[in-house]
Amino acid sequence: MSDAFGGYVCTSAAIDAAVASRSMLAHPFYQAWEEGALSADALKAYAKQYFHHVEAFPRAVSAVHANCPSAQGRRLLAENLAEEEGIGAGKDDHAALWLGFAAGMGADEAEVRASALNPETENLIETFRSLSRRSYASGLGALYAYESQLPAIAKTKIKGLVERYGVAEPRTLKFFEVHEEADIEHSDVCRELLDALPLSERADAHAAACELAEALRTFLTGMQRETGMAC
């Protein structure tokens, strides 16, 4: 185990290291956002593309939940899924929250839903779909590779929107505010479940996490291409 994962004993620690080397926050597109270098049109295009991933994401969580062999694990994942779907008093599903952000970027719901997916967006959605259904370990690794990055991403996105783009509308920021907090708990759940995997399944989780992290960065490269940003 330790040799296969560069000396890491815990699966989650090995995945953390792999994801850090494939960080979304280190991608030039997100760095440009943080610096205020993206145009309004680029942010609008991003809002339209990323919506399709946000809308598809609960189905990946559902597949991981369905494949989980542990009743306790299923309960924990069900709480994650309920959060994504907006189940509970006073909660909104996360696709609806994203539409609030898109509206703040100048794209109404009809425009967002009608937007054609670029190849990199299609690849991200299909990669997540495939990994979440391949096996429980694979889906869990992919889920962790995504959700473990979201609190830091959300924090920097809020900072960039407020300080660089003058965004003050609560509806525009709410998606990121929710994820800055909720995905700390979600990633903790995934970490606990990853480190409880049988030894024979840990390599699958690690490989899936690496594949999903690459697909996330490829999505951002697609946004560079679509918006004419130098790659």
Residue ranges of predicted features:
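Non-heme di-metal
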Residues: 2-231
